[in-house]
């Protein structure tokens, strides 16, 4: 067990070990929320989205100057800036020429983000060693429900290997992972089911709305997923993902764009109970809507947040206090940190 000294009144806080926390919570309903750190643990260089700009060759120089002006390489931040500027200009100038251009640049940048994410993926799940996938399944087997903010395909590929995992490790208890998709002709269509226990809160690259308005995912074994996604984009069946820059705009897309899948996943997060692990998330305010939903859920008793050696403990503790300190009806939420460095996720 690791100890860190807090600057707040000299209080010593325990940084717990993951295995100890799992043992202590064995009698509770355990849930997990995955952030980008989950994907970066697979390949930090590939899935550090701050580096996507380096690989983007089709962004106009005027938009790249905006990245430089705000000293950021975060696509979502610039998408937010373009959208808010367009909204302001629309109110100021009724000719709409400049605001329309900014809206278009925001959409172009969103498409570029999708293309870059596709390019940084392994070409198929066959490029990922089975042992790494099994390590991830060992980790996920500790939880009853999985929520993820990542829209890459890593989790999808991992879950496809559940049966192979059980064949090799028949004595390991792992729940039946259900993402809510069911056979529908040559696709898998999403249907609202209480048995669903895997939730892509911000959508995912493999999830799309077909020509009939159904939320679908490809009916394949994952080997050619990248080709399927690119073909879908070519046919204007774009991935269902939330790339808006601000928490407000993200929540608007989830709740106000007639998106039953995203709104259902969000509602299920608000309905979990007992224990929630937040793994691989910096607690950035861009996901404030998620943390507010957690804080308002009075059936959650304890939150465990991952902390790795590269992170600033004090900064993360202050963020956690900001999001989770205030609850309705004077209910308290117990917030603890656990050491992420000793977990073999991949």
Predicted regions located by residue number:
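Gly/serine-rich nucleotide phosphate-binding loop at the start of the catalytic core
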Residues: 1-144, 149-157
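SIR2/sirtuin-family catalytic core signature
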Residues: 2-32, 38-40, 264-346
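A Trp-anchored, charged/polar loop motif used as the substrate-binding/catalytic surface
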Residues: 13-19, 124-131, 178-186, 250-267
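Short catalytic/ligand-binding loop motif for oxyanion handling, primarily in non-cytosolic enzymes
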Residues: 39-43, 154-157, 206-211, 285-287, ...
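Short secondary-structure boundary/capping segments
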Residues: 45-54, 160-166, 216, 293, ...
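Short, flexible loop segments at boundaries between secondary-structure elements
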Residues: 64-65, 179-193, 300-318
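Extended, H/D-rich, highly charged conserved domains that either
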Residues: 70-97, 137-249, 257
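Alpha/beta-hydrolase fold catalytic core
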Residues: 236-275, 284-285
């Amino acid at each position: 067990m690791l100890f860190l000294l807090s600057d707040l009144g000299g209080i010593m806080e325990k940084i717990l070990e993951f295995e100890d926390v799992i043992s202590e919570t064995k009698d509770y309903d355990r849930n997990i929320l995955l952030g980008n750190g989950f994907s970066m643990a697979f390949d930090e260089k590939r899935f550090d989205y701050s580096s996507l700009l380096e690989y983007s060759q089709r962004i106009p120089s005027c938009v790249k100057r905006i990245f430089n002006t705000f000293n950021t390489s975060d696509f979502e931040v610039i998408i937010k800036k373009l959208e808010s500027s367009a909204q302001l200009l629309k109110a100021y100038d009724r000719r709409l020429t400049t605001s329309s251009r900014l809206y278009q640049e925001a959409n172009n940048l969103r498409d570029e983000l999708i293309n870059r994410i596709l390019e940084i993926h392994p070409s198929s799940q066959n490029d990922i060693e089975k042992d790494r996938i099994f390590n991830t399944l060992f980790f996920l087997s500790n939880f009853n429900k999985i929520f993820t903010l990542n829209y890459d395909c890593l989790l999808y590929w991992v879950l496809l290997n559940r049966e192979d995992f059980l064949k090799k490790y028949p004595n390991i208890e792992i729940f039946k992972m259900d993402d809510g998709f069911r056979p529908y002709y040559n696709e898998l269509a999403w249907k609202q089911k209480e048995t669903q226990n895997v939730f892509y809160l911000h959508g995912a690259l493999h999830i799309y709305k077909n020509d009939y308005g159904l939320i679908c995912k490809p009916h394949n074994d994952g080997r050619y997923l990248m080709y399927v996604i690119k073909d879908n984009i070519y046919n204007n069946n774009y991935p269902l993902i939330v790339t808006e820059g601000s928490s407000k705009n993200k929540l608007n897309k989830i709740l106000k764009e007639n998106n039953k899948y995203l709104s259902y996943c969000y509602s299920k997060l608000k309905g979990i109970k007992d224990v929630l692990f937040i793994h691989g998330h910096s607690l950035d305010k861009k996901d404030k809507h998620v943390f507010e939903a957690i804080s308002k859920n009075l059936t959650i008793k304890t939150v465990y947040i991952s902390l790795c050696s590269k992170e600033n403990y004090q900064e993360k503790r202050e963020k956690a206090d900001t999001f989770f300190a205030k609850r309705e009806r004077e209910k308290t939420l117990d917030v603890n940190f656990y050491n992420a460095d000793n977990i073999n996720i991949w």
